Amino acid sequence: MQTTPHNHACGSADHGISRRQMLGTLGGGVGFGSLLHPAIAKEIKKQEKRVCLIWLDGGMSQYESWHPLPDSKFAGPFRSIKTSIPGTHFSELMPHTAKIAHKISVIRTMETMDPNHSTGVPRIQRGDPIDRGVDYPYLGSAIAKLLGPADPGLPPYLWIKPGNGGFIHREAGFLGTRYGALALGDGRPPVHIHRPDSISAELDAARNALRQKANERFKAYRGASEIDAYETSYDMARQLMARKDIFDDAQLGPKDKERYGSHPLGRHILRARQLLEAGVRFVKVNSYHW
């Protein structure tokens, strides 16, 4: 019996690079580093693409999700079910995702060859399969460098994580501190995002101009790296102060809140959607509860 080959590209003019082309460009690379091939970066920038990376630390088993092996010794207690792609099966725990399998890409061959979680997690997010003596940037930092902000009035890379927030400059690796991630603890906006009533906009601008002059003088006699990180965190905070409306939960309807759920991961992903729709280029969402 003949079957029609599945078309992995969605066919939309908005998606000029098909999944087949992207995977071909990735070639033998491991992790996300090869996504930064100039051809892909140029196409993504032209289309004004934005990215949400949802990282589940530890994660669910592939045998109970994307790659069930019912006849192997590793099989769990759950059945495999058919998807919208002939010949492709998911776990029975994912019935809704199985219905839209033709709209997503599932990569079953990615690995780091690193058995340690503590080193494997950053390795796959950086895309450096072997140690080269260089601190490689994480995906969000690399995209911030290559594509820049989707909206010049917003930071290009935000990170929503449990716990505390702050500016995480080490994510940028060799790109330099200015491409680090601004972390939002529990998805909350930075502390003191509202300017005190006692400080006018004119006074605030004058204070920041004085700060910038002091930083320039300080950099002339000391290393610039730490000062650059300090300046970048300040600039990002000022951008968010000017756009604090993007954190307004009143704009979210009850239907959205119900769809995403009241648990931390659901709330954080909904916040990521808010930020992406507002114009942030890249948002990473972390869950540490797996």
Which residues fall in each region the model found?
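Ligand-binding pockets and gating/stacking loops
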Residues: 1-290
